Regions:
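Contiguous interface-forming segments/domains that mediate binding rather than catalysis
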Residues: 1-178
């Protein structure tokens, strides 16, 4: 289970070029030396808040293409959940096994299914976790999400209310690929 570390949550909102370098070094499995060099250059030339958000999304984001297979979406979010998530495709949609329970996510077998799946996962985990969209990814054909516990989201909202609202969008019934 991947979890968003406290120092990385704070990095999202505060930090200079040296902090960008430290973040990159904490995540060598994500950032090759060439990519690290590119991000350091960007941190020197571009708005730091945008660079920090981009880095954070590379490490903790769940990236969903508008053509993504729905079972793969479940698998990707499952990496951020405790325990095993098992998904099976059925004639009606998806069947998930999570935390000892079985859940169904009915699908329409249309492009709308990406967000039907995401909302279905969000409903299943809503007692402990929340999924939010990186706003900067909305107008793309690939959306990036972050899954964190309610405790983590609440702590961020208490300390960085305006910034959280600016960076993330809550998942709503209307939200879909543009």
């Amino acid at each position: 289970m991947k979890q968003v570390e406290q120092q990385d949550r704070e990095f999202l909102f505060h930090g200079n070029v040296e902090d960008v370098d430290a973040f990159l070094k904490r995540h060598p499995e994500v950032f090759s030396d060439d990519v690290r060099t590119d991000f350091l250059q960007a941190a020197r030339e571009e708005e730091l808040s945008s660079v920090r958000a981009n880095l954070f999304s590379w490490v903790y984001g769940v990236t969903v293409d508008w053509r993504e297979e729905d079972s793969e979406i479940v698998r990707l979010f499952g990496e951020f959940l405790p325990g095993e998530v098992i998904v099976e495709e059925t004639d009606e949609g998806l069947t998930l096994s999570y935390a000892g329970e079985i859940y169904s996510i009915p699908l329409t077998f249309s492009p709308n299914d990406r967000y039907i799946t995401i909302r279905g996962i969000a409903d299943i985990i809503q007692k402990q976790f929340e999924i939010r969209l990186f706003r900067d990814s909305y107008w793309s054909d690939t959306h990036v999400f972050v899954l964190m516990s309610h405790v983590q989201w609440q702590a961020l909202e208490r300390s960085h209310t305006a910034e959280v609202e600016k960076i993330f969008q809550k998942i709503t019934p209307e939200l879909d690929f543009p």
